[in-house]
Amino acid sequence: AEIKVGDTLGNPQFTQYGMLSTFDVCVANPPFSQKNWLASDMLPDQYNRWTASLLPPAKCGDYAFLLHLISSMKADVGRGACILPHGVLFRGNAEYDIRKNIIEKHYIKGIIGLPPNIFFGTGIPASIIIIDKKNKDNRKGIFVIDAKDGFTKDGAKNRLREQDIKHIVDAWDAQQTIPHYCRLVEWSEIEKNDYNLNISRYIQPIGTEIQHDIEAHLHGGLPATDVENMEIFWKACPTLKDKLFWDANNGY
């Protein structure tokens, strides 16, 4: 492996013929909301990461790092993940314009909301922005996972347990709806919400406005739709559903 130390934004170390080197996979965990990242010689940007009309705020470098990651990915096949504070999902002004542009290019494949207080030096919650240039033209939307409640206390910090990580990975691999946890948000819904990607807009927290099936309460039984919503578990254990449930009457 080739390891280099330098200023990612001001003086990228991986370049070729005056342009950024590109890779199949890129992963980044940049400093959150870095201030004063923009130097006078970075506009226009010789690496074409940003333009004057799509320029991250000088006092907040979150989108500068995300744009650098996207530019470092191979065209049409590059994949990447960047850990950033939740603010990138909904902040306005220049960041709104950049977010809208990235969304309209269908680069974002998924967003994973993480618990608060899991990183040293900050207690704010973060999210993993998953970028995938492959099949972007056929992508129907963004797969959103709300994993903010999956953690354990570990001294003064929160920590992801193995089962929390497995829950995230299994949900991502299955790409199926799990109520209150994950689902595919289609482009039309994102556009309707004015390109706001705040996770709480799309994933309903447990304990708020849960719809009750009155028929099930009165006569007993479990709605068949509730059983089908657990498809991720039935795929993992194909014979389990028939052992636990049977058709009592229409829809239950």
Regions found by a protein language model. Give the residues of each.
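Conserved SAM/SAH cofactor-binding pocket of Class I
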Residues: 1
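A conserved structural/catalytic subdomain of Rossmann-like adenosyl-cofactor enzymes
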Residues: 5, 11-252
